[in-house]
From Swiss-Prot:
UniProt cofactor note: Binds 1 [4Fe-4S] cluster.
UniProtKB keywords: 4Fe-4S, Iron, Iron-sulfur, Isoprene biosynthesis, Metal-binding, Oxidoreductase
Catalysed reactions listed for this entry: (2E)-4-hydroxy-3-methylbut-2-enyl diphosphate + oxidized [flavodoxin] + H2O + 2 H(+) = 2-C-methyl-D-erythritol 2,4-cyclic diphosphate + reduced [flavodoxin]
Protein role: Converts 2C-methyl-D-erythritol 2,4-cyclodiphosphate (ME-2,4cPP) into 1-hydroxy-2-methyl-2-(E)-butenyl 4-diphosphate.
Residue positions binding [4Fe-4S] cluster: C270, C273, C305, E312
Family statement: Belongs to the IspG family.
Name the record gives this protein: 4-hydroxy-3-methylbut-2-en-1-yl diphosphate synthase (flavodoxin)
Molecular functions (GO terms): 4 iron, 4 sulfur cluster binding; 4-hydroxy-3-methylbut-2-en-1-yl diphosphate synthase activity (ferredoxin); 4-hydroxy-3-methylbut-2-enyl-diphosphate synthase activity (flavodoxin); iron ion binding
Cofactor(s), by name: [4Fe-4S] cluster
Gene Ontology BP term (one): terpenoid biosynthetic process
Underlying gene: ispG
Pathway info: Isoprenoid biosynthesis; isopentenyl diphosphate biosynthesis via DXP pathway; isopentenyl diphosphate from 1-deoxy-D-xylulose 5-phosphate: step 5/6
Organism field: Pseudomonas fluorescens (strain Pf0-1)
Pfam families given in the database record: GcpE
InterPro entries tied to this protein: Dihydropteroate_synth-like_sf, IspG_bac, IspG_bac-typ, NO2/SO3_Rdtase_4Fe4S_sf
Amino acid sequence: MHGESPIKRRESRKIWVGNVPVGGDAPIAVQSMTNSDTNDVAATVAQINRLEAAGVDIVRVSVPDMDAAEAFGKIKQLVKVPLVADIHFDYKIALRVAELGVDCLRINPGNIGREDRVRAVVDAARDRGIPIRIGVNAGSLEKDLQKKYGEPTPAALVESALRHVEHLERLNFQDFKVSVKASDVFMAVEAYRLLAKEIVQPLHLGITEAGGLRSGTVKSAVGLGMLLAEGIGDTIRISLAADPVEEVKVGYDILKSLHLRSRGINFIACPSCSRQNFDVVKTMNELEGRLEDLLVPLDVAVIGCVVNGPGEAKEAHIGLTGGTPNLIYIDGKPSQKLTNDNLVDELEKLIREKAAEKVEADAAVIARG
């Protein structure tokens, strides 16, 4: 069950957002965005720290005005994770956060203003080694493209993106990534497919304004899953009307399902039925809650009966198959029997022991060079 992904990723140029590589042979980076008031430095720092604990690679922060820019500078000094400043309309805000140490600028060159203003932002980014994200969104296409196409379409999104790409290239700036987001899954997927054929820069994937926790997760998993399975995408952000930490969890779950990133437990569990020999749903809920802190990648199967249990358990690092008593498999081999008494406690202990063993084994491999 565990192993290399069969996906051949699209070749792209590598850029760096702080100390995080994006594109090329780098792992697909997981992003999120704060939803606190940026001027509330303490609240925003606390949220970023929670995101970092959840495993986020990069965090975007909205910077709508100069007061927020000054707050951003304070926030930057208090966190470790790379920060992207989300900026629209006022190019002076971009110049200020560049001075304050931003790791990436998210701009739309089309709404920054005149050529000299875009040039000033690009020069500031180049001088400080700051990459830029061109962020095209179906909800804010240029008026001439709205008139030309009548409505947002994949072709309109791509034309907008290429217009901005050419703009940066005219200024001899190549250190950028691009997104073409829409809330419609088919529109976003087709736009990314078209854009992937046109440029070599890394692609930032997302289904914008996807919805709440459940609906947004489904739409993002469908849309991003299609693209990632085709090898398209270098960094992802799951847009949810929910706690931003959930965006990180969903992002990793999507990548884990495609074997593109490994972090924490990959649970394989049956939906349960009347054949179950223990309460699968309760067991899973307890295990997921208890093991959130575990970052070691492990496959754990929790199957309620012997129909599919042995087969699934043999493919996992640790597998539990319901029976009388229940049977534990470790690395594909029967290991021990457990009754329903203290089942979760015993299983948690075995998983943590296996995780520690894996850490030790990996360290030994590294030590041997």
